[in-house]
């Protein structure tokens, strides 16, 4: 890839963002008010990424680019499917964490993408049994501002992208890639 291709960051006509996040493509849905809109934009992102891979393969003259919707490279690296919510600042952060942490941990039982094997940043990939979540091996703490090391279930970076006096950003980085809309 050229320097320009590695640093590309596009805002798409549907309001989504498509960019290179370190070594892999990342698609961020536009802001959505309804669950059905999130699902539609998630599926649109799959199609956009697939078309980009097809174009790249055509330009390279063969099937050099492979596309996977996952949360791990099976070499000890993980990337999350993030949720971001605009939340009223009048709700105490301690109330959010007390109510959300048990739900977020148990959500992986229902919505986890699953994988075979165990891995971590230090240990790499070890073949093994089936797990319900691809991301769980990499979560290390309940709350933290970090996203690359000491990964939290609930990220505390407060970037609301709105009126800071009224709102906070609830940034969840525990999620697995969505495989099913149900």
Which ranges hold each PLM region?
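Terminal catalytic/cofactor-binding subdomain
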Residues: 1-68, 77, 98-118, 124-131, ...
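Histidine-centered divalent-metal-coordination microenvironment in nucleic-acid enzymes
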Residues: 71-88
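Inter-helical turn/loop segments and adjacent helix faces that build the functional surface
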Residues: 90-96
